[in-house]
A protein has these predicted regions:
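Divalent-cation
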Residues: 11-226
Length: 226
């Protein structure tokens, strides 16, 4: 599927100077449909929207002039940690939880730096980062974890969302953000107009939503793909 949707590319910005209620309303208006498709609980919704925004920023901006691929896993922390292992000394270990919330602007810049390292980020339902640099165990004999044309990061995202209650958000080096829940690809977020003519969409029976005010296009799985 390609670039015949007439999407206008407008920079995606949710200003940090906004009043919190206004900012939350804008995030929900932009990504609420993704949360609904992922069957996200109310208590996890705000966290998921914040993480998706961070993922879109990474997809759009990259880091130090190059594209970045990474993975965020939200919720069911105990099971996620049990089904993953550290690839390196955890750069988030030992920091107080109040400085590790995804909504903190200074932390978001730190996370963007750490995203250049291998491994996944793990957050709890409240939006606190609990670990970074995690290698997610993937059952290589489960074909449902693999999508032709997508790599091991997306297999890990599908697998961990299938075997735990977590929702996973994968950022590809081609600048597309994909959201997985219950082992299924629930949405793709395309942050730039030119990508629509280059990227194949993998979301089953997608509903395409244009959000020109946010500068993104959403491909959200249809009900029959639930």
């Amino acid at each position: 599927m390609g670039g015949a949707y007439g999407i206008r590319a407008i920079p995606f910005v949710v200003a940090r100077s906004m009043a919190n209620d206004e900012r939350r309303a804008l995030l929900d208006a932009t990504f609420g449909v993704v949360c609904e498709s992922a069957r996200c609980s109310d208590e996890r919704r705000e966290t998921l929207e914040e993480v998706i925004q961070l993922a879109v920023e990474l997809a759009r901006e990259g880091r130090e002039g190059r594209k970045i691929g990474t993975l965020f896993v939200v919720g069911d922390v105990d099971n996620v940690l049990e089904q993953s292992r550290s690839l390196l000394l955890d750069p988030l270990y030992g920091h107080p939880s109040d400085v590790l919330h995804v909504g903190r602007p200074e932390l978001r810049e730190t996370i963007k730096e750490f995203a250049q390292l291998d491994g996944a980020f793990v957050l709890d339902d409240n939006g606190t980062f609990v670990s970074a640099g995690r290698f997610v165990d993937v059952d290589v004999n489960a074909p449902e974890n693999f999508f032709p044309g997508l790599g091991t990061r997306h297999a890990a995202a599908a697998s961990i969302s299938r075997t735990t209650g977590a929702i996973s958000i994968a950022v590809s080096q081609s600048s597309v953000v994909r959201v997985f829940a219950a082992g299924k690809l629930r949405a793709e977020i395309i942050p730039e107009l030119f990508l629509l003519s280059k990227e194949r969409l993998f979301t089953p029976t997608p509903e395409i939503r244009e959000l020109p005010e946010a500068g993104v296009t959403l491909a959200v799985a249809g009900d029959e793909a639930a």
